[in-house]
Each structure stands twice: as structure tokens, then as C-alpha cells.
């Protein structure tokens, strides 16, 4: 039985209460696995310097179980050391061990080899999956349990799973109960939470006792409807006696202020402290068309850049955290409501602004300016109307009726349009970028109004506001001058321009061993040990006119008779490839990453989807099957006997209602076939011999195993002119493959070999399909590396690690999202004077060329 008597973390209406202190908490994402160990301490100090109280940190399962049964918690995987550093920095930690984390990380942290187990239920209450999770939790949870807040550590809450309400979990209650029991069994006694990605608190928690709901809000920062949405969830959890915990949201402090006045007591903007995906760790995701590659540079515009540069939002962070510290328990215990009295706003603002009724007296009203222009508003009070100035992209926090006795001061702060960032016996301190108004009163005296000028940076304005015999000392400072609790911090910006690099040496070093193994059919990469890296395939295509490739991903380079033919990244979509009389076929398939989110529009976007060349077929025959489909009644008026039409050819005024087309396909009963619904514009349901599946316009193919296809029904919403051609392809499997696995460890091993070479200069021209190694000299210190060119992929290595990959301008390149696709980071502690590059040319309209390379200093 877990002893709760020593716990010093309490979850109540005021939020996470640490050692009895009731205060709204600001929490920054800071991920050890996206940083070299050498900078952990400095980044933690940077977060502390913004005034944030806490960090949230994922623990990626597959970062620690690097292969089945192979565990690594050393070096930059030493999460225990990171948590200890966070504690030493004075930061609380919300730990998020998954098992699934999303985070735009390879596979959402689920090990890719899980997908090799047939019928395993990922993120389900399924025994095999839970057995693997137990092995992970058996290692991760003791690390967290030993470092809980009540035991001298930093961990104040543990999040189970991540945004489960986005996923089709069959028995959420059973699944989340199993995770809860594992955590509690390892001695976790701080609050357990589960975050909802789209507001479904039961979908996220499973309705399990002992797991508190939290919410991830990602509104458009310019939306007028943030406040009423957030208040709705504040009311929902208040009915359960719980606080509104926002475990992820946008990074803008304007938006954070709007959430604060709408009832949030934990504000954890996602990725205030950006990072970098070192190694083969980015994911593929659905932020593209619909698929996309996540960049190694992991940056959503937070207040710290991936390389540690402090951005302007750090000043806004210090102001907001000073505001929450100043109001303390009164703010944490406040009740949110719709604001009254805000009117005549000259700029776009909230459709329903929020007001906090402070515990012990007073209110805080949020008045947003959702535009880039300065604005004004009027606020009605018991003292009359006050006009306030609104800075661009801001949310004024108007304090009214605040008793000052708790600060050792007389009277009441009746009104303040500047941010209250400090108060004690010496007076009150405010921050503002615009002119502001404060009003004080004491009992029996007429309220005194003071108009305050906007201060310049480094030039605070000082006032003595007097009412009768009572005086208040007031200081108004620019937000840039507001300090964190530990005092002022030196800026961490960078000076120095990018330097063009030369001094390249092309190495006489092989890019693969050439040692292959025989396989009857092309295996998936994971089956031959390539959990990260690439796989080489070769076979004969003598006498074959066309190939059909199903499920290939992520980056596929094809060659016939040693000549580059195609490069594509189609996220597993089926591809037809003409052979054109070739004799041999080669493919290099590189894993960019595994899907971090579950999206069924493309095979490679599904959680648990595997990588490699997929299934490769020769097209033995093709037949047009666009005609002779019967149209069934249902929501249409087609009668019996059913009329014959072409697929999609029914005419009806009942647009949008389902129309079902049915026919028997001319399958031979012994071969594999593929049905191609060419021109499909919307998802449709295809029932093959009674078994239904959804077919997406992004991959309009249906594979038919031998014997399937005697009865095919296609159901789609009726829309005039939305029909298309249909073709049936008869397939024969391509056999007798030679396969060379080249996992990340093999590539990194090659990158570390000594080799002679010849000096070369930029621009470097390559042939399509050609690849080689080059060494490039780099100036000392941390560096941002950039590459110029076209139709070239670059993998950069240093310090025994892959720094990252860049794909220069190329029509075959997919969309990159999540950060800067052209930047790689060489940390200063890893810089020994150079980097090793593996460069590969891709086929396209022109000749591949790496035109140049630059290195800019980073603030290490």
C-alpha cells in the first residue's frame, strides 16, 4: 500500500498545490532527448530565468529501448540525471512517460518493432501490448517515483498516455486502469493526469478514478472565442472539484493571459523551450498533403530557439509569472466568469471576455487586442468609465478592487490597467508598454486617479500617489525590465554572420558494405533489423513491363540497370512504375521516421505502420472495369431490377446521400489483384465479399487477395460528375530478393571510419543516384549549418551521432513541417573542427548539385 502521508503535492480547485503554496503555475516543455547532455543545465537555467515554475518532459519509450530488450539510460539518455538537474534548478516537473507521447517523435515513442507482432493492439487493453508497456514502466516509473516532490525530487505529477481522445481505443476504461495500476504499483503518489487533445475528458482518462483530466488547447491566437471555450471546461472540472489544467497550448503570452483569466491554474504552453531531433528520430505526420516529414529542427516559435537563443517572448514570460506570483493564492483560488463592463473596443477582441473573481476580494479582467495595431477600450467601473490603451497583440489584465492589506499597504487598488508585477510594504510595481491608469482609495477618502506614462526600456517611471494622509509609491517599468525571481539575466542572443565553408574532402569510403542476404519476398525494414536507417533491395525484372509497389516508405530511390529512375515519398500510397525493358531493379528505402499520429488516409501515416519497400508486384494484366455496375436503392431511388451505370454515373437530385455501385470483378480465383479507383475525389466504402474498408482519394487502391472480388460494392456520397475510371490489375509477386539492412548503427559506424580523400570545392555536382562521403571543416563552437543546392540529400554526422538530414530543393520532396528544414545544429561540445556528410543525388529535371554550405554561431 502506498503511504500518502509524506506527499506534499495536492490537487484541488486551486490547481497543483506544492508544499501548501496555492499559485497558478506556468510550465515550459523542455525535452532532454532533444538536447545534448552538455546543455541541459544551461537550458534549465534559461527556463528558470523566465520565471516559469515548472517544466513538462516526455520520456520516449523508444529512446530508451533502442531494440527489443536493449535498454539505455546512460549519457544523453540519463533521464534521472536530467530530473535531478531540474530539481537543483528549482523547477517542478510534470513527467509524461506515455507509453505513447506523440510529440512529433518517431512513432510517438512506440517502438517500431511492435508493428511486427501480428494482431497486437497498440494503445489498447490488450495483453501483449500491455506486457510490453509493463516492461517500459518497470524501468521508467521507479526513476520517477524516486524523484517525486514529496521524496526530495522535482516530479509533481505524472501524465499517463497522451491525447487518447484522438485514438480509437476500444476499452478506454480498461486501458487507462491498467496504466494507472502500473504507476501506482511503482509508488507514484503524486497526482496522475491524462490530457485531452480535443476536449473529450472521458475519452482521455477513460473515466478512471484516480486520473484527473487535463486539456490541450490549440486555438488560433486571433480567435475571438477562446474565452468561452475555456470557461466551459473550467466549469466542467469545477463540478468535479478539480482545477483546469492546461497541459499544452500555444506559446503566445497574449493567449496564455486569456486562458489564465478563463480559469486555468496550470498553463503549460507546448515547446516554449525548443529542441532538436538528433539522430534518426523525427516522425512522419499528417501536417502535410496530407503526409509530411517533421524537421530535425523542432521549433514552434517558443521563447527559446532550438539552439538556445532567447526570443522576445521571454520578457512577456517574466511579466506574466511576476503577475501570478504577486496575486498568489487569490489568483489560484479565483472563480472565472464572463466579464461585464468592457465596451467600445477599437480593435478585434474577444467575443466574450473573461473575469476572475479573486479569493479575498477584487477581480482581474482580460481585454485582448487580437490585431497588430494599437487600440483602445473602455471599462465601466463603480467609479465611472476608464479608457485604456491596448498594445498590439496583447491582453490587458485589469485589476479592480484589490485589498492591499495583504501586501502591507493601506487601502484598495481600485483600478489598474498596467500589469501588477510586485507589491510589498515599499509600494507597487507595474509593467506596461503603453500609458496606463491606476486608482487607489482608502476608507472615507475620495479615490485618487493617477495617469502613468509609458516607460522606456531601462527608464522606469516613479510616482507617489497621495490621498489625504495616505501615500502609495508606484513604479512603472517596461516589460523588458521585469526580472525573474532570481534577478536579471544576461541575454543569450547571438552575434556573428554565417560563414561560407570550404575545405571539403571527398573520401574514398564506401557508403554501404554490399553484403546482402536472400529473401523470397521483399521484407519490411523492421523485420531485417532496420528500426531506423535504410534498407537496400535488388532483384531481377527481366520480361516485366510494369511494377506495382504497395506500402513503400519513407524515401524511395529506384534504379533500373544501375540508372536512377524515380525518387518518391508517398507515405505508403500505391505506385505504378514502368520497367521499360530493364533487367535489374534496385531500391534504397530510407526511414525518415514512423508515424507519430494515427491517420488512415495514407498507409504510412497509421500508428504502427512499418517501413521498407512494401509489397512489389509485376502487373500481368490490366482490365477496364468502369462499366457494368448496378446501382442499389437505399438513399437513392434506383429500383429493382437495379439499373446498370458506370461507376459514379448515377444521376440524382439526392446529392450528398450514399449511392452504392455493385458488380462482380473478373478475378481468376488464384491471383492477387488490385482495383484502382482512378479519379476518386472523396473517401468511399468498398465492401469486398461483404468485408468493408474505407478507401481514401490519397490512395485509391483496393488489394484483392486470391479468391476475393466476386462481389464488390462501392458506396460513396452522390455528387454529380464525381465518377471516375476503374481498372483491375492482375498481379504476380516479385521474388528472389537480395537485401542489405543498413540500420542507423551501421551508418554511424561508417561515418566514424578513418579515410583518405581528395580535396573538392563547392559547388559539388553529382549524378542522380550517386552518393559519397565528404568531410567539411567547421569553425569552433556551436554552429547552425545550412546547405544550398538542389536534388541533393545530406546526412551530417559528428560526435558519433547523426546531427540530422536536409533535403535540398526537389520537386519530389514532401512537405517538411515543425521547424526549419534547412538547418542542422552542431552543438559546441560536439564540434571537433568538422562534420562528415553523406550526400546523395536524386533524379529530377536537372543535375543534382550541392552549391554551398554555411555555418552560423549559436549561443553556447
Model regions: which residues?
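Aromatic- and acidic-residue-enriched carbohydrate-binding clefts of CAZyme catalytic domains
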Residues: 21, 58-63, 67-70, 75, ...
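Carbohydrate-binding surfaces of carbohydrate-active enzymes
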Residues: 133-142, 151-154, 159, 172-173, ...
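Aromatic-lined ligand-binding clefts that engage carbohydrates, nucleic acids, or primary amines
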Residues: 545-560, 585, 665-690, 712-716, ...
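Substrate-binding/catalytic cleft of secreted carbohydrate-active enzymes
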Residues: 4, 95, 100-132, 138-267
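Aromatic-lined substrate-binding rim segments of carbohydrate-active enzymes
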Residues: 40-106, 180, 184
Amino acid at each position: 500500500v502506498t503511504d500518502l502521508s509524506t506527499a506534499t503535492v495536492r490537487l484541488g480547485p486551486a490547481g497543483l498545490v506544492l508544499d501548501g503554496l496555492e499559485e497558478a503555475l506556468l510550465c515550459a516543455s523542455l525535452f532532454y532527448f532533444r538536447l545534448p547532455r552538455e546543455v541541459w543545465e544551461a537550458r534549465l537555467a534559461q527556463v528558470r530565468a523566465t520565471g516559469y515554475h515548472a517544466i513538462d518532459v516526455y520520456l520516449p519509450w523508444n529512446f530508451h529501448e533502442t531494440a527489443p530488450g536493449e535498454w539505455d539510460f546512460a549519457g544523453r539518455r540519463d533521464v534521472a540525471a536530467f530530473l535531478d538537474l531540474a530539481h537543483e534548478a528549482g523547477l517542478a516537473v510534470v513527467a509524461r512517460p506515455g507509453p505513447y507521447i506523440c510529440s512529433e517523435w518517431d512513432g510517438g515513442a512506440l517502438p517500431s518493432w511492435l508493428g511486427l507482432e501480428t494482431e497486437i493492439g497498440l494503445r489498447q487493453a490488450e495483453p501483449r501490448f500491455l506486457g510490453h508497456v509493463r516492461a517500459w514502466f518497470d524501468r521508467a516509473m521507479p526513476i520517477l517515483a524516486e524523484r517525486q516532490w514529496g521524496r526530495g525530487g522535482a516530479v509533481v505529477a505524472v501524465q499517463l498516455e497522451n491525447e487518447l481522445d484522438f485514438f480509437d481505443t476500444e476499452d478506454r476504461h480498461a486501458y487507462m486502469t491498467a496504466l494507472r495500476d502500473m504507476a501506482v504499483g511503482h509508488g507514484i503518489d503524486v497526482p496522475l493526469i491524462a490530457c485531452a487533445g480535443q476536449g473529450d475528458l472521458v475519452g482521455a482518462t477513460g473515466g478512471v478514478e484516480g486520473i484527473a483530466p487535463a486539456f490541450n488547447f490549440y486555438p488560433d491566437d486571433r480567435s475571438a472565442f477562446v474565452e468561452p471555450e475555456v470557461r466551459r471546461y473550467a466549469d466542467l472540472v469545477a463540478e468535479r472539484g478539480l482545477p483546469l489544467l492546461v497541459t499544452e497550448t500555444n506559446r503566445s503570452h497574449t493567449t496564455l493571459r486569456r486562458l489564465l483569466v478563463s480559469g486555468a491554474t496550470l498553463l503549460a504552453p507546448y515547446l516554449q523551450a525548443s529542441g532538436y531531433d538528433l539522430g534518426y528520430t523525427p516522425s512522419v505526420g499528417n501536417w502535410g498533403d496530407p503526409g509530411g516529414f517533421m524537421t530535425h529542427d523542432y521549433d514552434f516559435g517558443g521563447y527559446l530557439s532550438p539552439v538556445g537563443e532567447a526570443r522576445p517572448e521571454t520578457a512577456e514570460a517574466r511579466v506574466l509569472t511576476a503577475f501570478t506570483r504577486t496575486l498568489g493564492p487569490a489568483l489560484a483560488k479565483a472563480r472565472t466568469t464572463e466579464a461585464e463592463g468592457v465596451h467600445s473596443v477599437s480593435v478585434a477582441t474577444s467575443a466574450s471576455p473573461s473575469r476572475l473573481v479573486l479569493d479575498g476580494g477584487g477581480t482581474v479582467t482580460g481585454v485582448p487586442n487580437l490585431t497588430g495595431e494599437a487600440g483602445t477600450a473602455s471599462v465601466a467601473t463603480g467609479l465611472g468609465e476608464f479608457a485604456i490603451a491596448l498594445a498590439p497583440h496583447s491582453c490587458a489584465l485589469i485589476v479592480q478592487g484589490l485589498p492591499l492589506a495583504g501586501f502591507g499597504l493601506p487601502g484598495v487598488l481600485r483600478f489598474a490597467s498596467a500589469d501588477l508585477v510586485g507589491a510589498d510594504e515599499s509600494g507597487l510595481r507595474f509593467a506596461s508598454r503603453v500609458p496606463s491608469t491606476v486608482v487607489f482609495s482608502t476608507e472615507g477618502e475620495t479615490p485618487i486617479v493617477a495617469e502613468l506614462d509609458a516607460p522606456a526600456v531601462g527608464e522606469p517611471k516613479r510616482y507617489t500617489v497621495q490621498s489625504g494622509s495616505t501615500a502609495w509609491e508606484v513604479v512603472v517599468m517596461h516589460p523588458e525590465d521585469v526580472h525573474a525571481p532570481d534577478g536579471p539575466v544576461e541575454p543569450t542572443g547571438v552575434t556573428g554572420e554565417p560563414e561560407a565553408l570550404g575545405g571539403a574532402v571527398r573520401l574514398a569510403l564506401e557508403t554501404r558494405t554490399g553484403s546482402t542476404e536472400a529473401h523470397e519476398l521483399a521484407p519490411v525494414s523492421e523485420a531485417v533489423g532496420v528500426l531506423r536507417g535504410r534498407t537496400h533491395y535488388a532483384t531481377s525484372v527481366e520480361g516485366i513491363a510494369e511494377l506495382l509497389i504497395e506500402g513503400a516508405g519513407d524515401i524511395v530511390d529506384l534504379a533500373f540497370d544501375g540508372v536512377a529512375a524515380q525518387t518518391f515519398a508517398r507515405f505508403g500510397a500505391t505506385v505504378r512504375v514502368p520497367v521499360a525493358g530493364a533487367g535489374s531493379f534496385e531500391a534504397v528505402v530510407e526511414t525518415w521516421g514512423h508515424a507519430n499520429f494515427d491517420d488512415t488516409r495514407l498507409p504510412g501515416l497509421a500508428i504502427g505502420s512499418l517501413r521498407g519497400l512494401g509489397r512489389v508486384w509485376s502487373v500481368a494484366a490490366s482490365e477496364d472495369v468502369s462499366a457494368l455496375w448496378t446501382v442499389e436503392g437505399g438513399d437513392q431511388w434506383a429500383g429493382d431490377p437495379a439499373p446498370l451505370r458506370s461507376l459514379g454515373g448515377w444521376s440524382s437530385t439526392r446529392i450528398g446521400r450514399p449511392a452504392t455501385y455493385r458488380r462482380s470483378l473478373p478475378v481468376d480465383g488464384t491471383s492477387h489483384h488490385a482495383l484502382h479507383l482512378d479519379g476518386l475525389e472523396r473517401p468511399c466504402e468498398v465492401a469486398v465479399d461483404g468485408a468493408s474498408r474505407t478507401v481514401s482519394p490519397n490512395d485509391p487502391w483496393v488489394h484483392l487477395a486470391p479468391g476475393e472480388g466476386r462481389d464488390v460494392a462501392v458506396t460513396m456520397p452522390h455528387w454529380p460528375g464525381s465518377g471516375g475510371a476503374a481498372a483491375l490489375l492482375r498481379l504476380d509477386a516479385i521474388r528472389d530478393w537480395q537485401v542489405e539492412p543498413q540500420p542507423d548503427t551501421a551508418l554511424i559506424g561508417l561515418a566514424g571510419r578513418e579515410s583518405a580523400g581528395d580535396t573538392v570545392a563547392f559547388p559539388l555536382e553529382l549524378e542522380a543516384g550517386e552518393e559519397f562521403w565528404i568531410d567539411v571543416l567547421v569553425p569552433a563552437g556551436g554552429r547552425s549549418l545550412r546547405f544550398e543546392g538542389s536534388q541533393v540529400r545530406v546526412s551530417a554526422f559528428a560526435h558519433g551521432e547523426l546531427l540530422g538530414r536536409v533535403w535540398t530543393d526537389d520537386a519530389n520532396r514532401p512537405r517538411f513541417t515543425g521547424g526549419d528544414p534547412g538547418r542542422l545544429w552542431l552543438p559546441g561540445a560536439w564540434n571537433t573542427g568538422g562534420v562528415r556528410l553523406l550526400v546523395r543525388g536524386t533524379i529530377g529535371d536537372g543535375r543534382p548539385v550541392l552549391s554551398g554550405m554555411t555555418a552560423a554561431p549559436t549561443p553556447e
